């Protein structure tokens, strides 16, 4: 790289592309895990929580589409929208966690399916986090600004209030 004397933009694009490829690979790993866990739910009773997971997955799908569009067009405004959407996904995940705990406490028969649903939801939430990482990489590549500190890392599902 240094033999060709790349400009700062070239280096930022290269670093960002490497980070983005890693995030995309992790997203694929989470998707594979979701598919494996989904097979275990075919014989389980359908819980209302699965509707929340559906809404959460639609939001994350939109985030993925938007972040890929932002990458293709170097659109930092769209990338910022993806970052802002992550908070909603995190809130849905926390709400779902509490809902699933309630189902498990109400009836022991719900423990297995609730556990699978929880891990599916966690994987969807992590896919959203990786979409947000990609959005941050886009902003860095285009503007040279690292948006670190904008969002809180980790989730609040296990925090005691």
Where are these regions (language model features)?
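Cytosolic, long alpha-helical scaffolding segments
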Residues: 1-161
